Amino acid sequence: MASGDFRLCDVVLDDSIGRSTPDVEHERAVAIFDLIEENTFEPAGHDGGPYRLHISLVDAKLVFAIKTEDDKDVSTHILSLTPFRRIIKDYFLICESYYEAIRSSTPSQIEAIDMGRRGIHNDGSQTLMDRLSGKIKVDFDTARRLFTLVCVLYWRG
């Protein structure tokens, strides 16, 4: 284990929830690919990774189970979904509008909806960073990709 290698090398979503729509599955695949390519992930009190992250929903709570690359347990963090519910609901509503707009709207309408979608996504990402504070240090881009995955899990669940 390389000391100070604070990054994710693998991210897995709980498969027991099942699959979702092709649009949502595409978002999941892109978020995982981008997350593995570039991220900052520093569990508090640990010397360094890289890390494997398993994200799941258990009893309506968000669970981040962290292991080292060689599968040694690092920590598990359980977060309430309550601070995310409104943001996720708003995000899903605007995503539905966005996917509809892609099929039938003008570029300026699509851009306006996309700006709103990104704004709500940023709010969710900041909320996730705040909830992880003191547990896992992440940069904003990492939080954005993780928030996408939280939404995918929530959508399936």
Curated annotation (Swiss-Prot):
Signal peptide: none
InterPro entries recorded: UCP032146
Cited Pfam families: UPF0262
The family this protein is said to belong to: Belongs to the UPF0262 family.
HAMAP family to which the protein is assigned, alphabetical: UPF0262 (MF_00678)
NCBIfam families associated with the record: PRK02853.1
Name of the protein described by the UniProt record: UPF0262 protein Atu0536
